[in-house]
Amino acid sequence: MSMPSLKKYAAALFAVFLMGQSVAAHAQLPDFTPLVEAASPAVVNISTRQKVPNAVASNGGLSVPDLEGLPPMFREFFERSIPQQPRAPGGGGRQREAQSLGSGFIISKDGYILTNNHVVADADEIIVRLSDRSELEAKLIGTDPRSDVALLKVEANDLPTVKLGNSDNLKVGEWVLAIGSPFGFDHSVTAGIVSAKGRSLPNESYVPFIQTDVAINPGNSGGPLFNLDGEVVGINSQIFTRSGGFMGLSFAIPMSVAMDVADQLKASGKVSRGWLGVVIQEVNKDLAESFGLEKPAGALVAQVLEDGPAAKGGLQVGDVILSLDGKPIIMSADLPHLVGALKPGTKANLEIVREGSRKTLKVAVGTMPADDGDEATNDAAPSAERSSNRLGVSVAELTDEQKKALDLRGGVVIREVQDGPAALIGLRPGDVITHLNNQAITSAKNFTEVAQSLPKNRSVSMRVLRQGRASFITFKLAE
């Protein structure tokens, strides 16, 4: 056989090999057909109506509606097509109906349905459309804004239901599938994989989200996320996007969280969560060095609320929480949802680092208050006594009134910031310094003494109160 013939023969064999690989790879892809056929009947479309003031502005004789209440796909269309004008004053006397669209799924034959809180929030009427196109009015049993879970009930019997799975067993890289009503297109199916678990999102402290690359769009909210066994492992809730559409970052509420919330809503119409009564922050590399940790990990306690569970259990400012009941705290965001999942009254074991030493505290978890916002502010005028130091700040003693308002025994208030380390780390007049280099500050004189003894070329921590919120910051003093 000639050389050209050998080359052609080898090329043909290689092509056959590639085709075989492609066929084998295709054969390994999951077939979602049985799953979709079995699960779809239990997935529902949810539409809501809400009466809102009708604000209408004039646009050259053309009546331009207020677009805020329209479903997202219609609102985006009109925003592109009709320029919005300022609302006409006094136009709120009349009312109109605002509508929204979402998804949900049936969890019991007698009509209990799970969806997102943001799908049904403030609705005057909730309509559930089943897979056979029949519609039922739903009653809102309860909502939980902190987890974005809502429980509905329709009056019906022998409804199709989903199979509930254990989201704790979900693995990163596992195939998952969503069924919902994106932009109102009922029972649309999309698939992808689990990208990560235990994700924390801004202002969503109590849910360890499942991150996927499943295509999720407006209208998918509240719909189920299935594993390959046809079990619901999450409720599709949010996407991260810069364009308003899907960008490969979707987030679902784990069913372990959703069902705990649903059970409480069904039993009492409200949700109780565990609460420590602390303000925490992330431990970065510099803070880890400052507090003598081997690596950045845990939740740094920046503030302990007076008479709260943590205070009663002996937790102190500057403690670093490493684990709760044996579960490691890798990032500070891990702590809130672990504590929140505990029943109030539970005695939890907290492993902490305090002044370089490890110890375990037993803390009785309290009940999260309805409003866990900031408790103290600092707006009183500082006293006239001053003390300057090598950090580039002038400080003053706190008055007794300030200490009482801020629940402090010591500390100093910044009067002036000059050029130097303080300016570089963003300190401002009015900030209150309570700790420096892991030492509590008792007076302006004490602050100056501690500042003068600070080490050079090593991370140093400082605890600062600004408008009632405490945090640790770090800096280094050069030679």
From Swiss-Prot:
The signal sequence is: 1-27
Residues at the catalytic site: H118, D148, S221
The residues covered by the PDZ domain are 265-356, 362-468
Annotated disulfide bonds: none
Q: Which UniProt keywords apply?
A: Hydrolase, Periplasm, Protease, Repeat, Serine protease, Signal, Stress response
Record's GO cellular component terms = periplasmic space
Quote the Pfam families the UniProt record gives: PDZ_2 (PF13180), Trypsin_2 (PF13365)
Renumbered to this chain, region (Disordered) spans 368-390
Could you say which EC number(s) this protein's record lists? Answer: 3.4.21.107
Catalyses: Acts on substrates that are at least partially unfolded. The cleavage site P1 residue is normally between a pair of hydrophobic residues, such as Val-|-Val
Give the enzyme's main class according to its UniProt record, as a single word. hydrolase
Subcellular localization is given as: Periplasm
Molecular function in Gene Ontology? serine-type endopeptidase activity
Where does this protein hold substrate?
A: G219, N220, S221, L276, G277, V278, V279, I280
GO terms (BP aspect): proteolysis
User: What highest taxon heads this organism's lineage?
Assistant: Bacteria
Recorded hits in NCBIfam families, A to Z, give:
degP_htrA_DO
Q: What does this protein do?
A: Might be efficient in the degradation of transiently denatured and unfolded proteins which accumulate in the periplasm following stress conditions.
The family assignment reads: Belongs to the peptidase S1C family.
Protein name in the entry = Probable periplasmic serine endoprotease DegP-like
Source organism per entry reads Pseudomonas fulva (strain 12-X)
Lineage, top ranks: Bacteria, Pseudomonadati, Pseudomonadota, Gammaproteobacteria, Pseudomonadales
